[in-house]
């Protein structure tokens, strides 16, 4: 999903250096503040986000548009559900 790297987003969450459960807790707040249909980019370094963020999206009905891993940094693009 490297084509997502330069995609314009409506918000960015930098969770670099934070460990579970902090990235998902912060994600919950950022998604809440995002407009419906908005695109959020998440930057994380905790490997557990590879499991936690996709589950978060499924559980709360948001769309995981893309994800990318490079040199221990995990990038996610999440579209907030509409309505």
UniProtKB/Swiss-Prot annotation:
* GO BP term, example: tRNA wobble position uridine thiolation
The record's section on SUPFAM superfamilies has: SirA-like (SSF64307)
Instruction: Report TM segments.
Output: none
What Pfam families is this protein classified in?
TusA
List, from the UniProt record, the residues annotated as the active site of this protein.
20
Q: Does the keyword Membrane apply?
A: no
Q: Which domain of life is it from?
A: Bacteria
* GO terms under cellular component: cytoplasm
Q: Which GO terms describe its molecular function?
A: sulfur carrier activity
Query: Keyword RNA-binding: yes or no?
Result: no
Cleaved signal peptide residues: none
Q: Where in the cell is it found?
A: Cytoplasm
Question: What keyword terms does UniProt attach to this protein?
Answer: Cytoplasm
Q: Any idea what job this protein has?
A: Sulfur carrier protein which probably makes part of a sulfur-relay system.
The entry sums up its family as follows: Belongs to the sulfur carrier protein TusA family.
The name under which this protein is listed is Sulfur carrier protein TusA
Organism equals: Pseudomonas fluorescens (strain Pf0-1)
| Upper classification of the organism | Bacteria, Pseudomonadati, Pseudomonadota, Gammaproteobacteria, Pseudomonadales
Q: Which gene encodes it?
A: tusA
């Amino acid at each position: 999903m490297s084509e997502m790297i330069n995609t314009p987003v409506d918000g960015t969450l930098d969770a670099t250096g934070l460990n579970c459960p902090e990235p998902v807790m912060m994600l919950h707040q950022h998604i809440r503040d995002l407009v419906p249909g908005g695109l959020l980019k998440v930057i994380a370094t905790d490997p557990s986000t590879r499991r936690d963020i996709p589950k978060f999206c499924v559980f709360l009905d948001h769309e995981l548009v893309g994800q990318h891993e490079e040199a221990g940094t995990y990038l996610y693009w999440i579209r907030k559900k509409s309505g």
